[in-house]
Amino acid sequence: MNSPDRFAAISDIHGNLHALEAVLARIRSMADIEITVNLGDILSGPIEPAATADLLISLDLPTIRGNHERQLLDCARAPGGASDQFAFEETTASHRSWIAALPATLPLGEDVLLSHGTPHDDLEYLLETVTPGGCRLASGEEVASRLGAVRRSLILCGHSHVPRAVSLADGTLVVNPGSVGIQAYTADQPFPHEIANGSPHARFAVCERGPHGWSVSQHMVAYDWDRAAETAQRHGRPDWASRLLSGRNEA
């Protein structure tokens, strides 16, 4: 696949069909978007995983898998976490075959690379560092170290849900478009930490090649988060419902 000159990036949908539809509508309204790419963590969550899969399969976007795709498929062998297990039980064998065929990384031409976490590990944040004291933004040196020998003009990642762009010393631009589906969560590994973007808006990014290199614009989209939260509540996840409404982790 050739590298596009202007494209949208989405990530971490987590089965939130309402947010995804709003983001895709916004992207369609924008001029000269050649493609939309999807950076993984697609279905796991207590909202509408099957309908989300149906929509994305029909669109046939360039898509990679995230850690939650692995975890969802692992539910065939043993019960998984609540979000993965719910998505596994709601989806069909056809949906899961689609997930299983997704690549871990995907190049767009010679100068753009799609990854979920780092290019080597879908569970490791690329642009954040987790310590015993919590989560902080990673330094340029930390980002470069996690990339190892991988270099492109533009590298896209997801996983952390935090919209951010970092320019490295060698000119590489690393972009996280943020999360379409959920703006706050807590995690236990490698140390307990939390992420909270502070508003419920769905996030995506637009990357554009110019005469002096790549530029990025980050976007926030309002959608019917009340409906998404009601669905999560109905599926027994008041924790998700609260986060969907606020973009924060407190009750």
Residue ranges and their predicted role:
Residues 30-32, 94-166:
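His/acidic metal-ligating clusters that form di-metal
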Residues 35, 62, 112, 154, ...:
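Structural motif
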Residues 14-18, 44-47, 68-74, 107, ...:
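Active-site environment of divalent metal-dependent phosphoester hydrolases
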Residues 3-100:
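Core catalytic region of metal-dependent phosphoesterases/phosphodiesterases
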Residues 2, 167-251:
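Acidic, His/Gly-rich catalytic cores of divalent-metal-dependent hydrolytic chemistry
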Residues 38, 157, 176:
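Redox-cofactor binding/interface segments in oxidoreductases and associated redox assembly factors
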Residues 5-14, 111-120, 174-177:
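Active-site-proximal beta-strand elements of phosphoester/diester hydrolases
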Residues 85-90, 132-141, 194-197:
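A short acidic, glycine-rich active-site loop
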